Protein backbone atom coordinates (compact mmCIF):
# COMPACT_ATOMS: atom_id res chain seq x y z
CA UNK A 1 0.00 0.00 0.00
CA UNK A 2 1.37 3.40 -0.96
CA UNK A 3 2.04 5.95 1.78
CA UNK A 4 -0.65 8.34 0.50
CA UNK A 5 -3.24 5.55 0.39
CA UNK A 6 -2.26 4.56 3.92
CA UNK A 7 -2.55 8.16 5.18
CA UNK A 8 -5.88 8.64 3.40
CA UNK A 9 -7.31 5.48 4.97
CA UNK A 10 -6.04 6.45 8.43
CA UNK A 11 -7.50 9.95 8.07
CA UNK A 12 -10.84 8.62 6.83
CA UNK A 13 -11.24 6.20 9.72
CA UNK A 14 -10.08 8.81 12.26
CA UNK A 15 -12.55 11.40 10.91
CA UNK A 16 -15.33 8.80 11.03
CA UNK A 17 -14.56 8.05 14.69
CA UNK A 18 -14.38 11.78 15.40
CA UNK A 19 -17.79 12.40 13.82
CA UNK A 20 -19.40 9.43 15.57
CA UNK A 21 -17.94 10.58 18.91
CA UNK A 22 -18.75 14.27 18.59
CA UNK A 23 -21.37 14.30 21.38
CA UNK A 24 -19.15 12.37 23.80
CA UNK A 25 -15.70 13.44 22.64
CA UNK A 26 -14.07 13.66 26.07
CA UNK A 27 -15.20 10.14 27.01
CA UNK A 28 -14.03 8.57 23.75
CA UNK A 29 -10.77 10.53 23.96
CA UNK A 30 -10.01 8.99 27.37
CA UNK A 31 -10.89 5.54 26.05
CA UNK A 32 -8.63 5.98 23.03
CA UNK A 33 -5.79 7.20 25.27
CA UNK A 34 -6.34 4.12 27.47
CA UNK A 35 -6.37 1.82 24.44
CA UNK A 36 -3.17 3.32 23.01
CA UNK A 37 -1.43 2.99 26.37
CA UNK A 38 -2.69 -0.60 26.60
CA UNK A 39 -1.37 -1.49 23.13
CA UNK A 40 1.98 0.14 23.88
CA UNK A 41 2.36 -1.74 27.17
CA UNK A 42 0.94 -4.99 25.74
CA UNK A 43 2.38 -4.83 22.24
CA UNK A 44 1.94 -8.59 21.80
CA UNK A 45 -1.83 -8.10 21.98
CA UNK A 46 -1.71 -5.58 19.15
CA UNK A 47 0.50 -7.88 17.07
CA UNK A 48 -1.98 -10.69 17.70
CA UNK A 49 -4.91 -8.48 16.66
CA UNK A 50 -3.06 -7.34 13.52
CA UNK A 51 -2.25 -10.86 12.38
CA UNK A 52 -4.20 -11.70 9.21
CA UNK A 53 -4.61 -15.38 10.17
CA UNK A 54 -6.53 -14.57 13.37
CA UNK A 55 -10.25 -14.75 12.74
CA UNK A 56 -12.49 -11.72 13.00
CA UNK A 57 -14.51 -13.50 15.71
CA UNK A 58 -11.40 -14.10 17.83
CA UNK A 59 -10.25 -10.48 17.42
CA UNK A 60 -13.69 -9.34 18.51
CA UNK A 61 -13.47 -11.54 21.62
CA UNK A 62 -10.16 -9.96 22.59
CA UNK A 63 -11.53 -6.43 22.15
CA UNK A 64 -14.68 -7.30 24.10
CA UNK A 65 -12.47 -8.59 26.93
CA UNK A 66 -11.19 -5.01 27.27
CA UNK A 67 -14.81 -3.83 26.99
CA UNK A 68 -15.11 -2.79 30.64
CA UNK A 69 -12.95 0.22 29.76
CA UNK A 70 -14.46 0.98 26.35
CA UNK A 71 -17.80 2.35 25.24
CA UNK A 72 -19.99 0.37 22.89
CA UNK A 73 -19.46 2.88 20.07
CA UNK A 74 -15.67 2.54 20.25
CA UNK A 75 -15.86 -1.26 20.37
CA UNK A 76 -18.16 -1.23 17.32
CA UNK A 77 -15.80 1.14 15.52
CA UNK A 78 -12.86 -1.18 16.19
CA UNK A 79 -14.97 -4.12 15.03
CA UNK A 80 -15.57 -2.31 11.71
CA UNK A 81 -11.81 -1.84 11.30
CA UNK A 82 -11.29 -5.56 11.92
CA UNK A 83 -14.17 -6.54 9.63
CA UNK A 84 -12.60 -4.45 6.85
CA UNK A 85 -9.27 -6.22 7.46
CA UNK A 86 -7.59 -2.95 8.44
CA UNK A 87 -6.40 -3.91 11.92
CA UNK A 88 -2.85 -2.92 10.97
CA UNK A 89 -4.12 0.70 10.81
CA UNK A 90 -5.66 0.73 14.29
CA UNK A 91 -2.89 2.48 16.25
CA UNK A 92 -2.39 5.09 13.52
CA UNK A 93 -6.15 5.71 13.35
CA UNK A 94 -6.38 6.17 17.12
CA UNK A 95 -3.38 8.53 17.15
CA UNK A 96 -4.86 10.55 14.26
CA UNK A 97 -8.17 10.69 16.13
CA UNK A 98 -6.39 12.24 19.12
CA UNK A 99 -4.76 14.77 16.80
CA UNK A 100 -8.20 15.73 15.44
CA UNK A 101 -9.54 16.09 18.98
CA UNK A 102 -6.61 18.33 19.99
CA UNK A 103 -7.09 20.47 16.88
CA UNK A 104 -10.82 20.83 17.52
CA UNK A 105 -10.15 21.93 21.09
CA UNK A 106 -7.32 24.27 20.05
CA UNK A 107 -4.83 22.26 22.06
CA UNK A 108 -1.19 21.73 21.38
CA UNK A 109 1.17 19.01 22.46
CA UNK A 110 4.84 19.97 22.67
CA UNK A 111 8.06 18.14 23.39
CA UNK A 112 10.93 20.02 24.97
CA UNK A 113 14.25 18.25 24.59
CA UNK A 114 16.97 19.46 26.96
CA UNK A 115 20.34 18.28 28.27
CA UNK A 116 18.87 17.92 31.77
CA UNK A 117 15.35 17.70 33.16
CA UNK A 118 13.89 21.20 33.19
CA UNK A 119 12.39 22.75 36.30
CA UNK A 120 8.69 23.60 36.35
CA UNK A 121 9.55 27.31 36.18
CA UNK A 122 11.69 26.81 33.04
CA UNK A 123 8.93 24.77 31.40
CA UNK A 124 6.43 27.49 32.30
CA UNK A 125 8.61 30.20 30.72
CA UNK A 126 8.92 28.20 27.49
CA UNK A 127 5.20 27.36 27.33
CA UNK A 128 4.19 30.97 28.03
CA UNK A 129 6.41 32.16 25.18
CA UNK A 130 4.55 29.71 22.90
CA UNK A 131 1.08 30.77 24.07
CA UNK A 132 0.43 32.54 20.74
CA UNK A 133 0.20 29.08 19.13
CA UNK A 134 -2.83 27.93 21.10
CA UNK A 135 -3.54 26.25 24.39
CA UNK A 136 -0.68 23.96 25.37
CA UNK A 137 -2.07 20.91 27.12
CA UNK A 138 0.80 18.55 27.48
CA UNK A 139 4.49 19.17 27.77
CA UNK A 140 6.87 16.26 27.50
CA UNK A 141 10.41 17.04 28.69
CA UNK A 142 12.76 14.58 27.01
CA UNK A 143 16.34 14.50 28.25
CA UNK A 144 19.09 14.26 25.63
CA UNK A 145 22.59 15.06 26.97
CA UNK A 146 23.98 15.21 23.41
CA UNK A 147 22.46 18.68 22.88
CA UNK A 148 24.90 19.98 25.56
CA UNK A 149 22.66 22.82 26.75
CA UNK A 150 19.67 24.92 25.80
CA UNK A 151 16.59 23.19 24.44
CA UNK A 152 14.75 22.01 21.33
CA UNK A 153 10.97 22.49 21.16
CA UNK A 154 8.89 20.32 18.81
CA UNK A 155 5.21 20.96 18.13
CA UNK A 156 3.36 19.56 15.17
CA UNK A 157 5.80 19.65 12.28
CA UNK A 158 7.65 22.66 13.72
CA UNK A 159 10.99 22.77 15.49
CA UNK A 160 12.62 25.53 17.52
CA UNK A 161 16.27 24.65 18.04
CA UNK A 162 17.88 26.72 20.80
CA UNK A 163 20.43 24.05 21.71
CA UNK A 164 24.10 24.66 22.37
CA UNK A 165 25.04 21.78 20.07
CA UNK A 166 23.18 23.36 17.16
CA UNK A 167 24.82 26.73 17.86
CA UNK A 168 28.29 25.16 17.97
CA UNK A 169 27.60 23.22 14.75
CA UNK A 170 26.65 26.48 13.00
CA UNK A 171 29.85 28.13 14.29
CA UNK A 172 31.94 25.26 12.93
CA UNK A 173 30.22 25.56 9.55
CA UNK A 174 30.77 29.34 9.46
CA UNK A 175 34.42 28.97 10.42
CA UNK A 176 34.94 26.46 7.59
CA UNK A 177 33.47 28.96 5.13
CA UNK A 178 35.73 31.72 6.45
CA UNK A 179 38.80 29.49 6.18
CA UNK A 180 37.88 28.65 2.59
CA UNK A 181 37.42 32.37 1.83
CA UNK A 182 40.85 33.26 3.25
CA UNK A 183 42.44 30.57 1.09
CA UNK A 184 40.57 31.88 -1.97
CA UNK A 185 38.62 28.68 -2.50
CA UNK A 186 35.35 30.59 -2.51
Swiss-Prot record:
Subcellular location: Cell membrane
Any Pfam family matching the protein: OSCP
Signal peptide: none
Membrane topology: Peripheral membrane protein
UniProt keyword RNA-binding, yes or no: no
Keyword annotations of the record: ATP synthesis, Cell membrane, CF(1), Hydrogen ion transport, Ion transport, Membrane, Transport
GO cellular component: plasma membrane; proton-transporting ATP synthase complex
GO terms of molecular function: proton-transporting ATP synthase activity, rotational mechanism
SUPFAM superfamilies: N-terminal domain of the delta subunit of the F1F0-ATP synthase, V-type ATPase subunit E-like
Entry similarity comment: Belongs to the ATPase delta chain family.
Subunit comment: F-type ATPases have 2 components, F(1) - the catalytic core - and F(0) - the membrane proton channel. F(1) has five subunits: alpha(3), beta(3), gamma(1), delta(1), epsilon(1). F(0) has three main subunits: a(1), b(2) and c(10-14). The alpha and beta chains form an alternating ring which encloses part of the gamma chain. F(1) is attached to F(0) by a central stalk formed by the gamma and epsilon chains, while a peripheral stalk is formed by the delta and b chains.
HAMAP family reported for this sequence: ATP_synth_delta_bact
Functional summary from the UniProt entry: F(1)F(0) ATP synthase produces ATP from ADP in the presence of a proton or sodium gradient. F-type ATPases consist of two structural domains, F(1) containing the extramembraneous catalytic core and F(0) containing the membrane proton channel, linked together by a central stalk and a peripheral stalk. During catalysis, ATP synthesis in the catalytic domain of F(1) is coupled via a rotary mechanism of the central stalk subunits to proton translocation. This protein is part of the stalk that links CF(0) to CF(1). It either transmits conformational changes from CF(0) to CF(1) or is implicated in proton conduction.
Protein name per its UniProtKB record: ATP synthase subunit delta
Amino acid sequence: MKRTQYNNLVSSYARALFLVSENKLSVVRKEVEFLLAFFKSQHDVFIYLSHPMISFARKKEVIFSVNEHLSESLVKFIAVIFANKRSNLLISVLEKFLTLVRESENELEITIKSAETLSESNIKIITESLSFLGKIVRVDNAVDPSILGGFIVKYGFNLIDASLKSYLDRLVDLSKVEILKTRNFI
